[in-house]
A protein has these predicted regions:
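N-terminal intrinsically disordered, cationic/polar leader segments
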Residues: 2-66, 76-77, 87-127
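Hydrophobic/aromatic-rich structural module bridging two neighboring secondary-structure elements via a short loop
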Residues: 82-83
C-alpha cells in the first residue's frame, strides 16, 4: 500500500511500501500515520484558502480519501492491536471524514475547516 502526495518534492516523505509497514514497530507506525495526517491537514488548509473548485481542493480530497481508506482498512483487521471500541470509534470518524470529503468533491459542501479540526484532533491523539 502506498500513501503519497501528488507533489513530487514531498512524495518520498509520505510514500510507504508494504514491506516497510510490516517491518516497523507500533511507535514507528503511529509516527508514519501522524506524518500522513499532517500532510492531509496541510493540503486541506491550502484547499480552504484556494476554494472548493480549485486544484488544491481536488488534491486534498483525493489524498484524504485515500489515506482514510487505508486507515479504515487497517483498523478493521482483527490483528490490529488497538482496543475494539477505539477501533470502532476511529472507523466511524474516518467514514465521516470520507463522507465530508466526498461532499466537497460533489461541490455540496466546503467544510474544510471541519475536516481540519477533526484531523488535527486525531493527529494529536497519536502516540
Amino acid at each position: 500500500m502506498t500513501v503519497a502526495t501528488t507533489d513530487p518534492g514531498k512524495k518520498a516523505m509520505y510514500q510507504f511500501s508494504y514491506a516497510e509497514v510490516l517491518d516497523e514497530t507500533p511507535k514507528g507506525a503511529r509516527e508514519r500515520e501522524r506524518q500522513a495526517i499532517d500532510r492531509s491537514i496541510e493540503l486541506l488548509q491550502q484547499a480552504d484558502k484556494a476554494g472548493a473548485r480549485s486544484r488544491e481542493a481536488i488534491e486534498a480530497v483525493l489524498f484524504v480519501r485515500r489515506l482514510w481508506g487505508y486507515l479504515i482498512e487497517d483498523l478493521a483487521k482483527p490483528e490490529n492491536d488497538l482496543p475494539q471500541s477505539l477501533r470502532a470509534e476511529l472507523i466511524s470518524i474516518g467514514l465521516w471524514i470520507m463522507r465530508e470529503a466526498e461532499q466537497i468533491r460533489l461541490e455540496t459542501s466546503t467544510n474544510f475547516k471541519g475536516l481540519i479540526e477533526v484531523s488535527t484532533a486525531i493527529r494529536d491523539g497519536l502516540q
